């Protein structure tokens, strides 16, 4: 099933229904077309088929030469996510900065200087947007923090959120046979 994600939703070969952010939305996430950020260049590719001028999401494209077993593994938690959790929950700004810098350096980005003023929560939000794109983790980050508005996938602005929008309805198969 996971192997169909790319071909059903993200491949540049689709005519209709392709899921892709606008160039402006993508640049709002990555702040620039950064060739140094390893989360940008391999996953966001501008197709050479002449069909689209925007970048398409290739994170779930099956590698041509790889063991299919490893292609479909999804980690329960990533080491980067653990560093983000520490950065978010610690009261020690130096520890938070150290955790963020460790991930940033390993993603090809410049570390924050010790004297640089950094809004840890804002940086965390930006890092979540880059690190977990297409995985659903960002939704749960927003839900956990009860964020009242989230960026729309297009250039239309923000989507207002409330408790009801953060809850998914239970499928009938989960409720049909309950007492």
Model regions and ranges:
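Acidic/polar-rich alpha-helix caps and helix-coil junctions
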Residues: 1-20, 33-179
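Aromatic (Trp/Tyr/Phe) and Gly/Pro-enriched flexible surface segments
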Residues: 25-34
């Amino acid at each position: 099933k996971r192997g169909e994600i790319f071909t059903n939703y993200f491949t540049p070969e689709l005519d209709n229904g392709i899921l892709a952010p606008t160039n402006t939305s993508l640049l709002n996430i990555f702040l620039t077309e950064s060739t140094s950020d390893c989360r940008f260049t391999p996953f966001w590719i501008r197709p050479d088929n002449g069909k689209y001028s925007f970048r398409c999401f290739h994170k779930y494209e099956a590698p041509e030469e790889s063991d299919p077993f490893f292609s479909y593994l999804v980690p329960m938690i990533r080491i980067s996510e653990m560093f983000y959790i520490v950065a978010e929950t610690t009261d020690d700004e130096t520890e938070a900065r150290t955790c963020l810098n460790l991930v940033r350096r390993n993603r090809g980005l410049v570390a924050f200087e010790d004297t640089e003023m950094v809004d840890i929560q804002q940086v965390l939000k930006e890092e979540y947007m880059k690190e977990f794109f297409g995985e659903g983790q960002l939704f749960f980050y927003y839900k956990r923090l009860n964020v009242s508005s989230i960026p729309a996938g297009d250039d239309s602005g923000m989507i207002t959120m409330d408790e009801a929008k953060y809850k998914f309805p239970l499928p009938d198969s989960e409720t049909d046979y309950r007492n």
